[in-house]
Every structure is written in structure tokens, then in C-alpha cells.
């Protein structure tokens, strides 16, 4: 926790540290996660193709599972995760914005407000 001091009306008020998160950093992190999923999906797809071609055994259900079911599961999962991160980020901004205003009004002079 980083605590900064602010001089206002002859009293010290503590302001909590706001992490440098915004839409672009969240999008970048999300794309990194998708790239990791893409690599794992390509690996699983190559393994399923190896089973399909090199062993001369027809596994249509396994092939369909690796080609369609797993990518669909990962895409839905990561879209929901991204929406959850965005929602919690905006809730954090609202909490920090209104919480700082309320704590400045309610804090007695000479005390730190630690959140």
C-alpha cells in the first residue's frame, strides 16, 4: 500500500494508490491470454491430426472435439473473464472516486485515512 500525504486545511489526508489500469492495458492482457490459448489449441489440433493421419485410425469424434468444442469453450470463457475484469475495474474506479470524497469529509484533522 502506498500512502501519499496531502496538505488541505491544515490537516493531513491520506490518499490511497490507484494502479495504472485502463482499457488498453486490459485489452493487451486479454490478447496475451488469447495468444496462449491459441498456441495450446494449435498444439492440441496438431496432436489430433497426428492421431487421425499417422495411426490410420479414424477418430472423428476426437477430431471434432479438438477442432470445435475446445475452441468454443475457451472463447466463451475468456470473453466472460474479460467482461468480469472490466466490470471490477469500473467498480474499483467508482469506489476510489466516491470513497476518497467521503473519507475527506469524515476524517478528523491530523489523522491518516488508510484504505
Curated annotation (Swiss-Prot):
| UniProt-annotated location(s) | Membrane
- Extracellular compartment residues: 33-52, 99-115
* Native source organism of the sequence: Saccharomyces cerevisiae (strain ATCC 204508 / S288c)
Domain of life per record = Eukaryota
Q: Which residues cross the membrane?
A: 12-32, 53-73, 79-98
UniProt topological domain (Cytoplasmic) ranges: 1-11, 74-78
Q: What is this protein called?
A: Putative uncharacterized membrane protein YLR311C
Keywords from the named record: Membrane, Transmembrane, Transmembrane helix
List the record's Gene Ontology CC terms alphabetically.
membrane
Q: How does it sit in the membrane?
A: Multi-pass membrane protein
Amino acid at each position: 500500500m502506498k500512502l501519499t500525504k496531502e496538505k488541505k486545511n491544515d490537516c493531513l489526508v491520506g490518499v490511497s494508490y490507484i494502479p495504472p489500469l485502463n482499457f488498453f492495458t486490459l485489452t493487451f492482457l486479454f490478447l496475451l491470454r488469447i495468444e496462449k490459448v491459441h498456441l495450446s489449441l494449435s498444439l492440441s489440433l496438431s496432436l489430433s491430426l497426428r492421431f487421425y493421419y499417422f495411426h490410420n485410425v479414424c477418430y472423428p469424434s476426437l477430431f471434432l472435439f479438438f477442432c470445435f468444442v475446445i475452441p468454443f469453450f475457451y472463447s466463451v470463457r475468456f470473453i466472460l473473464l474479460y467482461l468480469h475484469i472490466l466490470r471490477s475495474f469500473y467498480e474499483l474506479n467508482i469506489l476510489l472516486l466516491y470513497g476518497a470524497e467521503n473519507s475527506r469529509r469524515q476524517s478528523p484533522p491530523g489523522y491518516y485515512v488508510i484504505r
